[in-house]
């Protein structure tokens, strides 16, 4: 029997606000354990949460970016559970009235077609702390993450393969990153994914029993975990077994999933309205204010690059990988840079430099103005394409004017025949054996002179001009 795969994803995104959702503590990543905490995070008796308006701003932006309806009257709920990293014994979240609902995004499939994935809801909540189990037999709790604002984005079960899940996550991360509400760095925990997967016989409308997957710390592991579950569940069903509703974690070492616990339902959390927070009214003016702050998103930018600038679909996709890169490209083109030339540099030398340095384009000294100027002095013959690579590295590390650096460093190409011809004659005088080989008709003897000339000019001879003049002077030798 063959089965249809049904996948839905729950994505937790940490919002990059300066302070936490209900306390004034810093929400920044990477501090010493428990450095970013106060009495609200510790849940001291009598302390009350205070809503961070910036979190609602971010929630509205996310809902708009994901084509969602927005609840105009929004409230919070308590999700009750006991765990050491949750000192209140409940989490403040949203249950029946999330900030956003009924949304969708498009994903690109492997065959080039587009599929719409519906999004059920996006709700705001606080993150939990972090437990660390030491080798000394003790467990330690770090509450720096406690109260950091999250938005949880819950898709409908519209994905039919691990590849579609991967494509959805890629598109979602791209959109969220463009809004500026999160850096969506999985390695720092600011984007976390739980996957729900079930199988059903083809033709059956009712969903099968789902399994939840956790510990998916990369998009690649999401795909691998789902692929393993497809095989595990299909094998179990074909042998007459039944799927339990359970939570499993992906074990990267064993390339498989391991049972964590039998899955709880919503009733186990005993949700009820949060009594310490009021109802929040989100009016049209607030929504319009947030909409005005949103940028043009990747899909629209890709279409513009292809249709208006004549770039390939591949180039457009690479240039919109991050908002910072796309903004850099657009600024360079607006300054007069040729779109294809700018694209080639960003995908070539710039990308190689960023990978080698482990940096993003915002973290280096190169500016769109620098790059456009450098491309211009390549075009006018001031420097060669080969020399430009050296110039680029200087600009990436130090910034400044490309032309000023080239002139100061003595890197300007020699294109004047009045300068080059005497150097060519000196090359002939210094390489009598090569001249003799050329005069005797030895094959390819003329090619050696190009290297001699470039060495004599320390690589500054304009290659095109040098080739023309060499051919001219060599012909005189032959005559």
Curated annotation (Swiss-Prot):
Transmembrane segments: none
Database matches in PANTHER family: GLUTAMYL-TRNA GLN AMIDOTRANSFERASE SUBUNIT B MITOCHONDRIAL AND PROKARYOTIC PET112-RELATED, GLUTAMYL-TRNA(GLN) AMIDOTRANSFERASE SUBUNIT B, MITOCHONDRIAL
Gene Ontology MF terms: asparaginyl-tRNA synthase (glutamine-hydrolyzing) activity; ATP binding; glutaminyl-tRNA synthase (glutamine-hydrolyzing) activity
Family per similarity comment: Belongs to the GatB/GatE family. GatB subfamily.
Protein name: Aspartyl/glutamyl-tRNA(Asn/Gln) amidotransferase subunit B
InterPro entries, per database record: Asn/Gln-tRNA_amidoTrfase_suB/E, Asn/Gln-tRNA_Trfase_suB/E_cat, Asn/Gln_amidotransferase, Asn/Gln_tRNA_amidoTrase-B-like, GatB, GatB_C_1, GatB_Yqey_C_2, Gln-tRNA_amidoTrfase_suB_CS
Keywords in alphabetical order: ATP-binding, Ligase, Nucleotide-binding, Protein biosynthesis
Catalysed transformations (reactions): L-glutamyl-tRNA(Gln) + L-glutamine + ATP + H2O = L-glutaminyl-tRNA(Gln) + L-glutamate + ADP + phosphate + H(+); L-aspartyl-tRNA(Asn) + L-glutamine + ATP + H2O = L-asparaginyl-tRNA(Asn) + L-glutamate + ADP + phosphate + 2 H(+)
Record's keyword annotation contains Cell membrane: no
Gene3D superfamilies given in the database record: 1.10.10.410, GatB domain, N-terminal subdomain
Function description: Allows the formation of correctly charged Asn-tRNA(Asn) or Gln-tRNA(Gln) through the transamidation of misacylated Asp-tRNA(Asn) or Glu-tRNA(Gln) in organisms which lack either or both of asparaginyl-tRNA or glutaminyl-tRNA synthetases. The reaction takes place in the presence of glutamine and ATP through an activated phospho-Asp-tRNA(Asn) or phospho-Glu-tRNA(Gln).
GO biological process: glutaminyl-tRNAGln biosynthesis via transamidation; translation
Enzymatic class: ligase
Subunit structure: Heterotrimer of A, B and C subunits.
UniProt cross-references to NCBIfam families, sorted A to Z: gatB, PRK05477.1-1, PRK05477.1-2, PRK05477.1-4
EC number in record: 6.3.5.-
